[in-house]
Amino acid sequence: LQNKNLFPTITEIAIPSDNNYQSVVIDSINPKPIDVYIDADGNWLAKYRLLPSEDQDVLVKGGARVSYKPRKETLTKEQKETYLKSQKYWDADNPEIKKLARELNSPEKIFEYVVNNLKYDSTRVKETQVRAGAGGVLKNKNSAVCLEFTDLFVALARSAGIPARSVEGYANTSNSSQRPLSLFKDVLHSWPEYYDAKLQAWIMVDPTWQNTTGGIDYFNVFDFDHFAFVIKGTNSEYPVPAGGYKIPGQKSTQDVRVSVTSAFVKKLPGLSASTNFSKSYLGGLPIKGEIIISNDSGVLAPNQTVAVSAEKLSPSLQNLYFDKIPPFGKKVLTAS
């Protein structure tokens, strides 16, 4: 992270998070963030306060258990509408994309179109990539990398009325020609997912690898080789995944290291509470204060309720609800 300003600033970095295909344990974050929050796409974003002209390296260590079968997730009407919107690189309102979407009109047909009509360009992996976006790659179908395969799928799906978004992260491959990686110098990967209303789940697919492997099915059967770092749904450009946080002079460095193992130690969430009440109050006026719930563990803490009791005050018992808290995050509750 870098603050080029002459004044302090708050900035943030995305860390790998739980989603319907993976469970994440964060063993350590150094230095510890001032807070971690969950954005609209479920990403965990760690916040840092940087002094003027300060650079800060953040080291995150952890593990993840990856599944090939997604967990269910119900979307609200507002969420579905969000995942149908046109974005900078997902130009769902583009006339050509709208025409194709009307003809294809299903996730599988859209997937097949992307696989069969784009050509993977391995020469672009070594270059500083200019992201073409969905509309751009339709003008040059012979020069696509994983970003364009993903962008075109997302744009076509959204234009067809199918909620869709992109995933960026690590994909385990032993054959870079058949299963290439082409996102950032850390050689990450990008793939799309669409929402299946019948299954009530986000379904990940990989048109890039189906194209480059010559037909291995990455639509009906997913694998254990994809580990998401970030999900982009509300914004086609943000957040940036681990490996994408580069400052001048570090663009060729490798910041992400992943090893595959069968060992995964599941942890239970651990919460702590502190209070912020005034030491004195005026008689007849309501007593208000804050209760800070902190997640001191490395795993996601689920929604729950905390009971607040008082011996000589009314009400004598209050139940305060709070939403999920990510590792090293906190919630501030108001009690009165």
Give the positions of each predicted feature:
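Asparagine-centered strand-capping/turn motif at beta-strand->loop junctions
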Residues: L1-N5, I292-G298
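Intrinsically disordered, low-complexity N-terminal segments that are enriched in acidic
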Residues: L1-Y68
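Short acidic, flexible loop segments centered on an aromatic residue
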Residues: E12-D18, A144, G298-S314
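Acidic low-complexity segments
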Residues: I38-G42, L50-K141
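Intrinsically disordered, low-complexity Pro/Gly/Ser/Thr-rich segments with frequent PxxP/GP/PP motifs
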Residues: N43-D57, K312-S336
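Active-site neighborhood of thiol-dependent amide/isopeptide-bond enzymes
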Residues: E103-E108, E112-S190, Y195, T213-F224
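Active-site rim recognition segments
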Residues: S174-S272
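Short, solvent-exposed loop/turn segments enriched in Ser/Thr/Gly
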Residues: G283-E290, N303, Q318, K331
